[in-house]
Amino acid sequence: MTGDTITTSTESISHHTGSISAYLATPSRPGEYPVILVFQEIFGVNEHIRHVTKRIAAEGFIAIAPHLFQRTAPNFAIGYSPAEIMEGRLHKEQTTGAQLISDIQATIRYAHTLPFVNPKAVGCIGFCFGGHVAYLAAALPEIEVTASFYGAGIPTTTPGGGLPTLECTPNIHGTIYTFFGTQDPLIPVTQIDLIERTLSTHHVNHQVFRYPTGHGFFCDQRSDYHREAATHAWEQVKTLFNTLKTPDSI
């Protein structure tokens, strides 16, 4: 399946508060495909997130990236300048964990209505802010596999305030892979150690990957991009996501 052509579109997901815009990428060939939710950085569903979504679809998945800042900034998508970082953080600070969970559940319900979907095979991936969101989503019963990239604040906070997201670890029933840079100023190594210990304590099937990089090493549009780390991490993501496939679809 790898490398097959894909189809992309912008979709509207019904939600009890209105609707959520989302970027959808699907394999063009008929089949039965797992679903992967793609969670944005603070920069919205921008070119990088759309590219990741397409890469996942090309590997044989239905991939969908909901706009997580839809309430404050519909269809938000910006770059990586200092001013844009400040803008993205402003919207992040207006987003709560309860809203995110509600949006994720709405996205899963929407995905289940799509043609060629395997509704029992759902995973997620997220980067930066989205890496934190992915850890939060991992505790949902629908999520079987999670890839969380450099999510800051997991042991100390949750979006909008409340108990730290790390407290949801006992509810993770699937497999979670986390990816961190040991030179990331936003995520001290002591926090990475704590996440790893907590996952082990609660017997969550997991792997914690550490790279000698800074923050955002997977994104080739950021100054901390690290080709070797990004390539290695992508191979781990593919291995993880392929566990969702039936033997005849790999």
List each language-model region with its residue ranges.
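N-terminal cap/leader regions of alpha/beta-hydrolase-fold enzymes
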Residues: 1-250
